[in-house]
Structure formats: structure tokens, C-alpha cells
Amino acid sequence: GINNMNILLTILVTFFAGMGAGLGTGFAGMSAAAVISPMLITFLGMDPYMAVGIALSSDVLASAVSAYTYGKNKNLDVKNGLIMMVSVLAFTVVGSYVSSLVPAATMGNFSVFMTFLLGIKFIVRPVMTTKEAMQGVSAGKRAAQSVICGVLIGFICGFIGAGGGMMMLLILTSVLGYELKTAVGTSVFIMAFTAFTGAASHFAIGGAPDWTVLILCVLFTLIWARIAAVFANKATPKTLNRATGVILVLLGIVVTIRVITDRGQTKDRISVAEAENELEEATGVSLKLDGAY
């Protein structure tokens, strides 16, 4: 009986985790790690290190399939995406290094709060930039902007250790004046690569994952990300802004509740923040990029 219960619980938890993560990825270019890892840790009692590795693995395919969907609908700028990715990766390392020199620069629940605020912003003040306005900027200027934004995003993620997907969406829409679909498309494109490096380093350090949980998470996240991405590309800007906003607000609330309930529990289970610090010492970079928390 116990085994069947366990399997059922595993399927339920991974299904809802994958659903939240997939919708977040496909709609908002949000990292799956923010949803999947807390759920695996809380409900399946999984080791935080492995949970983050599994979450990042789920991110890889979900982001890739979302990027493909956005790309097919001409909502992805591959060249500038690549330029930005290189600068994000480089400056995450710089940010990490600088933050190691400055004591106590972590802002633990910063990204949860940010997710929530960003969600509200999309509902209240939708991003209504058009593609035409976006393409009015010369190619050279766009490339230069991509570098500068990559540097900004990377440095902030490295320094604070939070909010990769969120920072990207915020900076792309508000600073670079990207139209929302292109911003999400670019964000998931970059995330597919950063999550891959993160996942690879996790399994290299922490050993093989729980394959059942990994496969279920990857599968469910992939399915929901594809559904969300197809819907997002068909939607009008206003609808998309609202949908993105609602999903971000919901994810923010869910993770916040978890942070609060987690405080009250026994201290013997490592807090997510501590697990992250250990991870960051071990991998140097991977987590901060993906901005899991």
C-alpha cells in the first residue's frame, strides 16, 4: 500500500510542480526552479541540492521548446539573444566574485517579492510596445544594448544571487523597450543554456538524480510550457500581459506561503537559502544565473 501511495504522491507533486513551472516558463520566461525545487523539498522531502538539479533539468527542455515556439512565431531575436547570453554568463561570475568580497549581500526573499511585484506591474501597466517600434532601433545599437543589458542582468544575478528570469523580463521590457512576446522569447532562449550548465554541474557534483522524479518533472513541465507558449504566441498583447501578470502573482504567493510555513518547521532540514549557499560555493555560478529564488 505504501508504495502505491508514494507513487501517487510523486505523480501528483510532480504534475502540479511541472504545471506551475511550465506555465511560468511558457508565459513569462520564468525559471522552473522557483516552483519545482520548493515543491520537491516540501512535499517529497527531497535533498535540496538534488531538487534544484531536477528543477534545472526541467528548465532546459521547457525553455528550449518555448524558445522554439516563440522563434517559429518570429518572436525571438536569436542573434541578440546569443550576445546577451554571453554577457550574462560572464558577468554572473563577476557579480559572484564581487559579492564574495562584500559581506552579507544576499537578499533571500528578494526574488519572490520581485516576482509578485512584476506580476502586478503587468496587470496594471501592460507592456504595449509594438514590434515596429522595436525594429526602429538600428542593428548596431540593438547589439550594444544587448551587451549592456546582459552585463546588468548577470551582475545583479551574481551579486544578489536571485531573479535571473525576472530580471531579464523586467530589463528587456522596461530598459530595452522589447515587445512582451519577444522579451519572453529571448528570456527562455537564454534560460535553456544557463539551466543546462546549472543542471550539468549539479549532477556532476551531487551524483545521479532520482530518475522517476526527474523524468516526471521534465515531462510535465515540457507539456505545460508548450501549451503556454502556443497560447502566448496567439494572444493579443493585452491578454498576454494579464495572463503573465496573474501567473507571476500566483507563483509569488505560492512560494511566499512556502517560505513562511518553512520557517515554522524543524530546523534539522536545511533551509533552502543554506542549500543555495552551499551550491554556490560548489558551482560558483549555476544557481544565480537561473535565479531560482
Q: Which residue stretches match the model-derived regions?
A:
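Membrane-interface alpha-helices at helix entry/exit sites of multi-pass transporters
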Residues: M46-I54, K79-N80, G177-V188
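Transmembrane helix boundary and interhelical junction motifs in multipass membrane proteins
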Residues: F27-I36, G161-I171
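Short, structured loop/turn "capping" segments at alpha-beta junctions
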Residues: T130-K131, A162-M167, Y178-T182
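Alpha-helical transmembrane segments of polytopic integral membrane proteins
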Residues: S37, S57, L61-A64, F116, ...
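Juxtamembrane transmembrane-helix boundary motif
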Residues: G1-L23, S37, I41-F43, P48, ...
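Transmembrane helix-bundle signature of multi-pass membrane transporters/permeases
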Residues: G22, V52-V60, L89, V184-A195, ...
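A small-residue-rich subset of transmembrane alpha-helices
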Residues: S58, T186-H202, T212-A225
